[in-house]
Amino acid sequence: HHAHDKMRYYRLSESRIKRIIRYPSRTEEGIIENGIACMQPTCGKIYSEIWVMYILSGLVIERKIKIITCWRYPGKSQNRDPIPSEILKEIHMLV
């Protein structure tokens, strides 16, 4: 419910969230355990970034992406911890 409330608050559609997960401009470690945060910049007069935080849940064979939250960051955020390449390969196989 939290992610749906945030999507409504920031006027983000499900397809936009899926697009951010499939084609992120930047991917970092999330603040929760095993969390992944990915970002895409928005186009417009004022620069902002849309972030999605999710975790990979389930068994190795039946992996699923569970969206924790999404938000719009006003401005440019600093680069933080990148995701290891093995996890990125696993995510690309799911999507």
Where are the language model's segments positioned?
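Ribonuclease/tRNase effector modules and their secretory precursors
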Residues: H1-V95
